[in-house]
């Protein structure tokens, strides 16, 4: 197993874990890293399986909360309403994602220029929304009404365009509809769980014939890197956005997108 392949796997896993849950688009960063730095994914199954590291990271960090919600379901109307809200928010992306999976993967994911432009546009939008003098009406994810959750889920569908960011779309939508920054980020975490598990299962099924024991070392390296980085981000993000908002992520998006466009122009 070549050292370069291991380094590529670790870098891609690290990028996946660091960017999956923040509003900068993990897909854009992984694809642009592959395009400009030569860190090529060992295969479609590698890209799918390192996402499992990020999924397990958020499930581990939120295990106690998830267990408390599950135990409260038989007796708590609030817990049942919250679960319903998350499922309603998940539904639009599940339906559209399953129907448009082939087009998204084969067409949109192969367009680096589109990804860079979307990074910049999304960064500008996130910056403007973060600076708006909005008055929050919802500060606790357990108080989100199902109708609000469904609207946030519709925003999540925008993330099917590479470079948009799943968390960025849901957070922007939530802020515009009256949530505070911390709860918007936390609801994005909860919504990520069924969304990422569903996307992982669909991608794994679509690529089932490409599974190979030969790539197990590379997959393990990327998986572990994504898992460790994901834990760090999930544990620190809520406090970060409570104090600093989303402007740093907006600026990062604009810088990465601009650098990507310049790189594409220079490379012809």
Curated annotation (Swiss-Prot):
Main subcellular location of this protein, as a coarse class: membrane
Keyword hit for Ion transport: no
Membrane topology, from the record: Multi-pass membrane protein
Membrane-spanning parts: 5-25, 43-63, 84-104, 109-129, 184-204, 213-233, 248-268
Cell location: Cell inner membrane
EC number: 3.6.1.27
Pfam family, one: BacA
Keywords: Antibiotic resistance, Cell inner membrane, Cell membrane, Cell shape, Cell wall biogenesis/degradation, Hydrolase, Membrane, Peptidoglycan synthesis, Transmembrane, Transmembrane helix
GO biological process, one term: peptidoglycan biosynthetic process
GO cellular-component term (any): plasma membrane
Domain of life: Bacteria
A molecular-function term among this protein's GO annotations: undecaprenyl-diphosphatase activity
Reactions it catalyzes: di-trans,octa-cis-undecaprenyl diphosphate + H2O = di-trans,octa-cis-undecaprenyl phosphate + phosphate + H(+)
Misc. remarks from the entry: Bacitracin is thought to be involved in the inhibition of peptidoglycan synthesis by sequestering undecaprenyl diphosphate, thereby reducing the pool of lipid carrier available.
Protein family membership: Belongs to the UppP family.
Role played: Catalyzes the dephosphorylation of undecaprenyl diphosphate (UPP). Confers resistance to bacitracin.
Name of the molecule in the record: Undecaprenyl-diphosphatase
